Amino acid sequence: MTSRRAVMFTGVATAMLTAFAPVAVPATAATGDATCSEPLAGQSLPRADPAQVSMDPAAVDAALDFGAGAGGVAVQIYRHGCLVGDRTPTGNVPLPLASATKGVSATVIGRAVTLGYFGVDDPLGKFFPGADPTHANITVRQVLTQSTGLHFSWPADIAGLYTDPVLQTLAEPADFEPGTTFQYAQNVIAVLSKIVELTTGSDFQDFAQRELFTPLGIARENWVWVRDRSGNTALNGGLAMRPDDLARLGRLMLQNGTWGDRQLIDADYIGQATTGTAANPGYGFLTWLNAGDTYRGTEVPSAVAYDRPQFPGSPRDLFSFEGALGQFVTIVPSRDMVIIRMGVPLRINLANPVGMLTGSGNPDNKELYQRITAAVTDIPAEPYVNPYTLSDPPLPIHGLDDLGRVIDPVTAVSILLGVGPYASTACNILWCNGKPVPVDVFRLLLDVGGQVVGALGALGNYQR
């Protein structure tokens, strides 16, 4: 545990950062540049030639070819609201976002906050009255910024998926004071889905569709979002969505939460979501930032500190929803730009395999963003940084104790069996919340099967 003085300092620093969270202002289109209005539901996204939005056509083509050649199955570049080029051989089909789901989830949370259902500084005890003081005092903000301080390991979180991650979260002991330490946790995010349901009276997915996706023109059959064993929407990585619809979400973020004449998400929330914390200057509300001079990564048993921005050589106001193997929804306000990159890596950094959890560890993605942003002709490019010469810090495993924290067998078994200090007595792998596992599995298969059937039936709609 950190000292009381350190905790107070961290709290004050975080409060100062969030109180003065800047709201990014998208770059204004140069005189004579094309601008494209927001598409209506069912409409194709408007296009423009690169030169019409002050981008070098040859450089755009070269960047797109590079991205596709580096494993991208959907690479799209938008400027001033216009699609200026893409390489999307898979067509406009729903693609798995992995952890980029977290960023989309943060937009849904932002909509609920904007509508006044709860606030980011509300404590969990407001929604879970049975929580003990340790868990009750954790705030929504600390969940969004991955700084709850609760015990985290991958085996424990995987075990939680087979039981109930909300109950698991409320049973986990604290390793750190809330707000002081960044950990790239997974199951703790499930409490956000439950909070939306408790406060709005709607299923999380129904709320997301009604209040956010429908206003953006995203049809229900355009996405699939799986649930965990207990029926909670998997906010940590369970969404598959069409690249074009991800571009709509990216544009919403670029426009500080406005769409047409509606303020779907408060600009203040967007500003806080894209501002780092004392625990991790490179991470906002489930969103990765290029603004920090340093950032902490996804390593276990403790997140490693990097002494550089996440994307050296790219604009510092860049922020991104990021998922394993290189799923990106990236916004660059200073270039009035949205970039979509979905696919797989053709290069693996063996020195930092955990970096694959966000795709940022792959130098090809760093190179791609530099090429795309440097193609803008009305704003000087950032100084080039060769990503292939960058070295990553060593993994934080220095002995058997660290290895034990990574493997964490006692915690995982405790959760699966429903016994011990890490587990909820109401849930184990065979019986959870009054239901046997076959009932839960059948229900989940019906749910995701219905979504997949709907998505397959809609593949012929909204041709690009």
Regions found by a protein language model. Give the residues of each.
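Active-site helix/loop module of the DD-peptidase/beta-lactamase fold
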Residues: 114-148, 202-236
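Active-site Gly/Thr loop motif
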Residues: 220, 276-338
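Active-site-proximal alpha-helical segments within enzyme catalytic domains
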Residues: 188-195, 237-259, 282, 327-344
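Short, charged, amphipathic alpha-helices and their helix-cap/turn boundaries
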Residues: 77, 82-83, 153-178, 202-223
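Structured C-terminal helix/loop/strand segments within mature extracytoplasmic catalytic/sensor domains
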Residues: 32, 318-464
